[in-house]
Amino acid sequence: MLNNEYKNSALKIFSLKGNEPLAQEVADHVGIELGKCSVKRFSDGEIQINIEESIRGCDVFIIQPTSNPVNLHLMELLIMIDACRRASAANINIVVPYYGYARQDRKARSREPITAKLVANLIETAGADRMIALDLHAPQIQGFFDMPIDHLMGVPILAQYFKNETDIDPEECVVVSPDHGGVTRARKLADILKTPIAIIDKRRPKPNVAEVMNIVGEIEGRTAIIIDDIIDTAGTITLAAQALKDKGAKDVYACCTHPVLSGPAKERIENSAIKELVVTNSIQLDEKRKPENTKELSVAGLLAQAIIRVYERESVSVLFD
């Protein structure tokens, strides 16, 4: 817990249904109780939200990842923003540990929507004033918003685990990006761990199907750490792990900020060359979806610090590294 000085302040933290354990942990770090609100369903599936305490003049922080079921959690968030606006909250801040639709950030083919931008429009129209986000799939999504975005990174949390809680020797380790787009992320982890990096040249013939083609970098005899922002069906990560093993990697670890883990992900990871999967709790994982060799790290402390700094009108940039 950081402190208790916010118990009777104008700082209010609310949780919807997206990740209640994470929200509770954040509130515990800040030193306040979660705000009282009810989220119910009508018999026809419509969402009803009721804020059960006064928030007039308060700085409200709504914690809600828009993870599976994406549309339901997104609608909960939009309705809660509207409720806070109509209840005269001074500032409505949304804390989105996982931003759904982030992979639809551009037109890859003709006549496709840019859904990440549409979601940004919906959030701003509903009345949000600021967003605290964690590892957006494409950092340029920040430009889809006109309101301030505090974009936090999960890499330091992952790095501290490998640095302090494993017996990996940095001199015999290599950080691997599963594609060219993740090189910046891999470089950041490698800089913290003081290791070299490698890149996997990947060809994706159709969605959710990946084929590993080539590895650029020294792999043989090293412990490889593959890092990505999202692991969804785990096709990319498991093929990458096998390719690294085939190139002589000693052990293969995989890590990500957002464990979507849909479809065959659990089975693929458990039957792969991956020794351990390291993830954060940005998305609430039930046991049915969690591979046996999974280590879950908490981002609650990071989010709590960001919330306090925003509330105190202090710089958040110190948390970016």
Swiss-Prot record:
What does the cofactor section's free text say about binding? Binds 2 Mg(2+) ions per subunit.
Compartments (UniProt record): Cytoplasm
Q: Name one GO cellular component term.
A: cytoplasm
Q: Which residues bind Mg(2+) 2?
A: D179
- Residues reported in the UniProt entry to bind ATP: D44, G45, E46, R103, Q104
Q: Where is the active site?
A: K202
SUPFAM superfamilies according to UniProt? PRTase-like
Which InterPro entries does the protein's record reference? PRib_PP_synth_CS (IPR000842), Pribosyltran_N (IPR029099), PRibTrfase_dom (IPR000836), PRTase-like (IPR029057), Rib-P_diPkinase (IPR005946), Rib-P_diPkinase_bac (IPR037515)
Q: What is its EC number?
A: 2.7.6.1
One GO BP annotation is: 5-phosphoribose 1-diphosphate biosynthetic process
Question: Which controlled-vocabulary keywords does the entry list?
Answer: ATP-binding, Cytoplasm, Kinase, Magnesium, Metal-binding, Nucleotide biosynthesis, Nucleotide-binding, Transferase
Name a Pfam family for this protein: Pribosyltran_N
Explain the purpose of this protein.
Answer: Involved in the biosynthesis of the central metabolite phospho-alpha-D-ribosyl-1-pyrophosphate (PRPP) via the transfer of pyrophosphoryl group from ATP to 1-hydroxyl of ribose-5-phosphate (Rib-5-P).
> Its quaternary structure?
Homohexamer.
**What is the protein's given name?**
Ribose-phosphate pyrophosphokinase
